[in-house]
Amino acid sequence: MEPEEQSTLVVLTTGKEAFVRANAVLQMTLMVRKTAQSPVELLLLGQGVEVLRSNQKNSPQFEQQLAGLREAGVQIAVCEVSLESLGLTKDQMFEAEAVKGGVEVATRLQEGWHVLTF
């Protein structure tokens, strides 16, 4: 019996305060995409939106990892409510689709996606 294709939403709520953890989640997201060959989306929520900041010390490394995720076909989304609550704007960030995080998670759950939160 063939396994069903299972889409995965990875939610990153850890920001620059835990660089090693955020880095590990980005690497794990890439491995899920390459291994599963099914849709994978990375949602940056809460402090996790800081990974997208283009003007911080670790920006070059995050930019490289995000580019690798995009090349592998991972959709990258950022919670616009989190951006606003942290006083950040989209022009301070690397490219990502702006979504309402709670709505995105609820939608993906209704669609049967696995949701992994870090």
Predicted regions and their residues:
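Anion (oxyanion) recognition and catalysis
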Residues: 33-34, 70, 109-110
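Short, glycine-rich nucleotide/cofactor-binding loops
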Residues: 6-23, 49-56
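A glycine-rich helix N-cap at a beta->alpha junction
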Residues: 58-85
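Basic/polar N-terminal segments that are highly enriched at the extreme N-terminus
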Residues: 1-4
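Short internal beta-strands
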Residues: 29, 40-46, 76-80
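Small/aliphatic-rich secondary-structure junction motif
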Residues: 34-39, 45-51
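C-terminal structural segments of small proteins and small subunits
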Residues: 85-111, 116-118
